[in-house]
Amino acid sequence: MTEISEYSAKLPAPVEQFILHWGDMGSHWGVNRSVAQIHALLYLSARPLTADDIAETLGMARSNVSNSIKELQAWNLIRRVPILGDRRDHFEAETDIWEVAARIAAGRKEREIDPAVDALRACVSDAADDPTISPVASKRLKEMLAFTELVDRFYMQMLNVPRPRLVALIKLGEKIVSFLPTGKTK
């Protein structure tokens, strides 16, 4: 468990479970556990929260909350909202789960896929001019580049698909998969 266990009386059990689970999942995805827990709390909150509210509810250091808020804002997953009569910053999460997924995917593409494509292109180009590169290594670099570019193109195409059509496409994919034979094929 994490920090919030001693503060659990302040949160309903399902909310606490979700926050803890989201924090664990975040750490598996390469996101700081505190960042993921704060996102989960704001996602489920019925009202905008201050950094002090977050720190108290989750039992986190205020500095940790501040840094985590900056990271969530950089991912465009939360926003600062003004509250009339209160000078403190309040924060709320994007609650449209499709939008959350799109923003996370965009952030991961920018931070991971784009640099990978650039690096692989450079490696393939450099390998073409290097007589010390084995044909096996050259072939595998080209295959990895082709795969990464394919994933990148697919992502870019999916950005332009309206949500209702995307939902229909996902459901269609489920139906198609049910007709395919099971087991791995090469």
For the regions a protein language model found, what residue spans apply to each?
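C-terminal regulatory/oligomerization modules of transcriptional regulators
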Residues: 128-186
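Amphipathic alpha-helical dimerization/coiled-coil segments
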Residues: 98-143
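Glycine-centered, phosphate/nucleic-acid-interacting loop/turn motifs that mediate DNA/RNA or nucleotide
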Residues: 76
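A short acidic, leucine-rich amphipathic alpha-helix
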Residues: 53-56, 72
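N-terminal leader segment of winged-helix/HTH proteins
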Residues: 1-28
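Short, cationic-aromatic polyanion-contact patches
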Residues: 29-34, 50, 83-104
